[in-house]
Amino acid sequence: LCDRRQRQMCIRDRQEVDGWEKAVNSLLEDSNTDIYVTGSNSKLMSSEISTYLTGRYISIPVFTLSFAEYLEFKKDSGRTPKELLNEYIRMGGFPIVALGNFDERSSYQIVEGIYNSVITSDITKRHNITNFDLFNRVVKYVVENVGKTFSANAIVKFMKGEGRSLSVEAVYNYLEWLEKAFVIYRCQRYDMQGKTVLKTQEKFYLADASLKYCMMGFNPKSVAAMLENIVYFELRRKGYDVYIGKNSTKEIDFVAVRRDERIYVQVCRNLPEESDREVANLLEIKDHYPKYVVTMDELAAGNINGVKIMHLADFLLSKEY
C-alpha cells in the first residue's frame, strides 16, 4: 500500500478483531484504498458502525437472491423462468438453498437454521431476552401479518386475548431489534396528497419469503402477501425508497422513489376480469409517473389507460423501471 494506486481491501468477520476500526481509519488516512467491511451482527449491529467510522463509510444493503440471480444459479436446470418463478416463490432466495437440489422440507430446515442462528445470536443473547416464548409469539404475529398494516397496540391487544401480558414499549423494542438484525423491514405509509411520510399503520416485510414458510408451513392462501414481499425487495434492490401509498380513502401497494424518479405498483395474484380496484386506484393518481399492476395471471398483459399490466416474472427481470 505504499504507492498511490487505487486498491481494494475486504475485511471479513470484523467482530473477531478488537480495534478493527483503528486499522480501517488508518488505512483511510494513509492510502488510496476502498475498504469493504463485513461481519456478524452478534457483537456489532450495522447501525452501530457510525460510532466507529463517523462520516467515513457507506452502508451497502445486502439482500437474498433476486429472481434474476436465482435464474443464474439455476441456469443449467433446463427449466423456463416462469417454471423457476414458482420454485423461487416457495423456496425463497437464500444462496445456500439455490445452490443445492433440495426438496421443500430440506430447504425449510436450512432456512430455519439460519433464522434460529440470527434470533439466538443477534437478538435474544444480545438483548438478554428472558421470555423467549413471548418474543417468539410476537415474531409469529409479524410473520402471519406480512403485507398488512398493524400497530404495536394491536399486538398488545392480540397477546392479551391469548392471556399474555406485554407492554407497548416491549413491542417497539422487539420490532426494532428484528429490524436491526435484518429479519424484518419496515415500510411506512406515504400520504400522496400531503406529500408526507406517516408514522402509523406501517407494514413489515420479511427478509425472505422462505422465513414465513419455515415457521408457518407453505399455505397457498399466503402467496398473495408474499408476492408483495418479493416485489418490495426487488424495488429496494433497484435503489428505491419504498412506501405504502395513501390516497384519500384508497391504498396503493407501493410508492417507490429514487431521487427524482417515482413509480406506483399494485400487486395481485390474479387480475380479475373486472380489475377496477387495481387499475382504478392507480388512475386516480394525476401525475406522469409510471404505474404498474404486477400479477401472476398468465393472460394479463398490456396497457389500460396508461397503467402497464405485467406478469411478475417479467417485472422482476425488467430493467426499464
Q: Where in this protein do the model-derived segments appear?
A:
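Short glycine-/polar-rich loops that comprise or flank the Walker A/P-loop
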Residues: 7, 33, 54-58, 260, ...
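Conserved catalytic/switch belt of AAA+ P-loop NTPases
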Residues: 21-37, 42, 50-51
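Catalytic cores of nucleic-acid endonucleases
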Residues: 245-246, 269-313
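Accessory nucleic acid-recognition modules appended to NTPase machines
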Residues: 102-261
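Interdomain motor-coupling "hinge/lid" segment immediately C-terminal to the ATP-binding subdomain
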Residues: 40-42, 46-149, 182-185
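Conserved Walker B
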Residues: 13-17
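Single conserved hydrophobic/aromatic residue that forms the stacking wall/gate
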Residues: 1-11
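Conserved beta3 VAIK motif of the Hanks protein kinase fold
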Residues: 265
